[in-house]
């Protein structure tokens, strides 16, 4: 079975179509929002590492940087990061099917072992911005 995902983005709407053997199976349309919502996924850039908090601040385009704690990286962060790095402009992307999983993140590790300032990472909003604090 041949599956194809088609994404169309314009200023007011995002459309995602799933086709199987060139037959439309599913179609989702969503109005574009300018705000940041829980569940949204962004490609961000690490702005600051805070070793004392075992956390980092990430620029995702919000007026305040997002906060990510070491425990929020997830056990498969190294594998996900390898995939994100391969998808950057000027690099040849990798196929997810053939990707080998990296060893999982240790629960007692340090964020500086996995992140560095200027690094691009994929993040998902778990908590919206409140008062003077950015998203988490």
Give the residues covered by each predicted segment.
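Single-stranded RNA-binding surfaces
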Residues: 1-136
């Amino acid at each position: 079975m041949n599956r194809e995902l088609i994404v169309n983005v314009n200023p007011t709407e995002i459309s995602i179509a799933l086709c199987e053997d060139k037959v439309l199976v599913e179609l989702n349309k969503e109005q574009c929002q300018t705000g940041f919502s829980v569940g949204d996924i962004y490609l961000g850039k690490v702005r600051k590492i805070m070793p004392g908090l075992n956390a980092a601040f990430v620029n995702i385009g919000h007026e305040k940087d997002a906060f990510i704690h070491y425990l929020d990286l997830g056990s498969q962060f190294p594998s996900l990061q390898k995939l994100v790095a391969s998808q950057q402009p000027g690099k040849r992307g990798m196929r997810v099917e053939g990707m080998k999983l990296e060893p999982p993140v240790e629960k007692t590790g340090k964020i500086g072992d996995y992140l560095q300032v200027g690094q691009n990472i994929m993040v998902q909003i778990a908590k919206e911005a409140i008062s003077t604090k950015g998203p988490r």
